[in-house]
Design a protein with these regions (language model features):
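Carbohydrate-binding surfaces of carbohydrate-active enzymes
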Residues: 170, 182-183
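Conserved functional hotspot residues at active sites or interaction interfaces
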Residues: 7-10, 24, 127-174, 239-292, ...
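Intrinsically disordered, low-complexity Pro/Gly/Ser/Thr-rich segments with frequent PxxP/GP/PP motifs
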Residues: 190, 194-227, 306-338, 432-463
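Hydrophobic, well-ordered beta-alpha structural blocks that scaffold small-molecule cofactor pockets
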Residues: 2-153
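Short, structured motif recognition centered on aromatic/hydrophobic residues
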Residues: 169, 187, 230-234, 284-288, ...
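A short beta-turn/strand-edge loop motif at beta-sheet boundaries
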Residues: 175-182, 291-297, 413-419
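Hydrophobic, ordered structural segments
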Residues: 107-122, 126-134, 209-257, 325-369, ...
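Short, surface-exposed beta-strand/strand-loop-strand elements in extracellular ectodomains
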Residues: 183-189, 298-305, 419-428
Length: 518
């Protein structure tokens, strides 16, 4: 039940890496507003033909059904003959029959494509395109190239204002640093059921300046009741960067809620990972924000223990642009920390938030991460270790031990990561390595927590400065394989209050003159 859309392509042989925009163009809230009238015209056709020269029709069909209405599908490229499209065999465009009363050219800015086939269109056949779904020109940064990524600098944020639960989004105008003049944000707030609560535009400050969107101020401005839903953000008239980056603060009225996470990934993924199972005194809630104008079918969002095939589906359909809180412990009641949960998202939503709610009343927010499906183990990493020093380093801070507990948990972040051959290094603030622990060839379903307190106590050690950092690195002494996509979750808890924070990072090769694989 995954959406058959392409959202992001990583670097690879013969492809242009980066985010894809067709799904964003079709799924933009303004496109969704215009779609019913456009789609009704298609449905009224006696015999609809679809001309699909660019291969867009099946993506359109994911959002606005075409297959049930199309009497014929035509293509431009002869190579596409014999490749089913919209459930039927396509024909060349020069075989367009005379009995079609409506021809859909599945493209934006299709004037050139229409002119190329004008002599083939029977008299009396109406021609329509995707242009009725297009955004107004004032929202485009590159009007001459509608699907240019810069035209769809968009993102979603979890946004709520309820008793004890407030949110604040903080971002910056980095677009003007690239030369953008008068950029602004186009914003739409959806409630939990996906209904629009407010739509507005907001000018951005001068180059490098910060912008804040506070749920209390939005609530007051639009005279809203309590809400918990999605804020859709579209940066317009921009240059240089097609992603809306932000920090998301959650805070309460009494100090029990205070946490921060960063932006959602703007491209919905098939899988996410790094969702921790709850401790006995915790509840872990996964926030799912439907990022498209079509429902998520019941059972399409699935959770499973990391490394296990058996999954459990969320048995409720989620309406377009709606938000749902999924209790991970209710779906997987036998799973507990340090076990991890994999999310089969089906490309239905952007990188999700999760909240940890503790028995002491404290709660914190963090995010899962995109789990790559294209990555495979790279034998060169093991072969080149003599040239790489520590190689890929996954660092996490160790906060002052007198005040905080620091815990690390390796997190598989690629579907092909069957194992992680790892060791942990503990380093004092002065740069001195205090301890090393070989963790072994860890299977993806059995990754241990690394509790700094327990490690120091077990080995009778201390951090002379009282704080420092921890590093996870590959260690191939017992064999194993690696892909360079090493991630970990860091968990920090204040001893005095019990308040905590989760964060996650990925590894890099730091400060090296040589490179490997890029």
């Amino acid at each position: 039940m995954a959406l058959q859309i392409e959202t992001f392509v990583n670097p690879g042989q013969g492809v242009t890496p980066g985010g894809r925009t067709l799904f964003k163009a079709l799924g933009h809230p303004l496109a969704a507003d215009a779609a019913p009238a456009w789609h009704a015209r298609l449905a009224r056709a006696q015999r609809l033909a679809v001309y699909d020269p660019l291969g867009y029709a099946e993506v359109v069909d994911q959002f606005y059904p075409l297959a049930a209405h199309a009497a014929a599908v035509h293509v431009q490229r002869l190579e596409d003959l014999g490749r089913p499209r919209l459930g039927q065999e396509p024909r060349p465009i020069d075989a367009l029959a005379a009995d079609h009363d409506l021809l859909l050219i599945a493209a934006f800015q299709a004037d050139r494509l229409a002119a190329q086939i004008a002599h083939l269109v029977p008299a009396g056949t109406e021609v329509v395109t995707l242009d009725p779904l297009a955004l107004p020109a004032e929202l485009l940064s590159a009007p001459r190239d509608y699907l240019a990524p810069i035209n769809f600098a968009t993102n979603f944020a979890l946004f709520r204002d309820e008793p004890g639960q407030r949110t604040r989004i903080v971002g910056a105008n980095y677009w003007s640093l690239y030369g953008a003049a008068a950029p602004r944000l186009w914003l739409r707030l959806f409630d939990a059921e996906g209904a629009p609560l407010a739509t507005w535009a907001q000018d951005l400050p001068p180059a490098g300046g910060s912008i804040t969107l506070d749920s209390r101020e939005v609530r007051k401005r639009f005279k809203l009741d309590d809400f918990c839903g999605s804020l859709f953000m579209h940066a317009v008239r921009v240059k240089g960067h097609e992603v809306v980056k932000y920090a998301l603060d959650t805070y309460g009225d009494d100090g029990t809620t205070l946490s921060c996470s960063h932006d959602a990934n703007a491209w919905p993924a098939q899988y996410y990972a790094g969702l921790p199972a709850p401790r006995p005194n915790e509840r872990v809630v996964l926030w799912v924000q439907n990022s498209h104008p079509v429902p998520i079918p019941a059972g399409a969002v699935r959770l499973n223990e990391m490394g296990r095939d058996e999954s459990v589906g969320f048995d409720e359909a989620i309406p377009p642009f709606a938000t749902r809180a999924i209790d991970a412990g209710a779906l997987l009641p036998d799973l507990a920390w340090p076990a991890q949960i994999e999310i089969d998202a089906g490309k239905h939503f952007v990188r999700p938030r999760y909240e940890v709610m503790r028995g002491n009343g404290r709660q914190r927010i963090a995010h899962a991460n995109v789990e790559r499906t294209d990555l495979r183990p790279d034998p060169r990493i093991r072969e080149m270790m003599p040239h790489l020093g520590k190689g890929y380093i996954m660092p996490l801070p160790v906060l002052p031990l007198a005040d905080f507990a620091s815990i690390a948990l390796p997190t598989p972040m690629a579907r092909a990561q069957a194992e992680l051959p790892l060791k942990a290094l503990l380093i004092d603030a002065d740069g001195q390595q205090v301890a090393e622990c070989f963790l072994g060839r860890l299977p993806r379903y059995a990754l241990p927590e690394i509790d700094v307190d327990a490690w120091l106590e077990r080995d009778g050690l201390s951090l002379p400065s009282g704080y420092g950092h921890l590093e996870l690195v590959y260690d191939f002494r017992d064999g194993g394989e690696a892909d360079g996509w090493l991630h970990a979750l860091g968990r920090y808890e204040q001893r005095r209050t019990g308040h905590g924070a989760d964060t996650s990072f990925g590894s890099h090769m730091f400060n090296m003159a040589v490179t490997l694989g890029g």
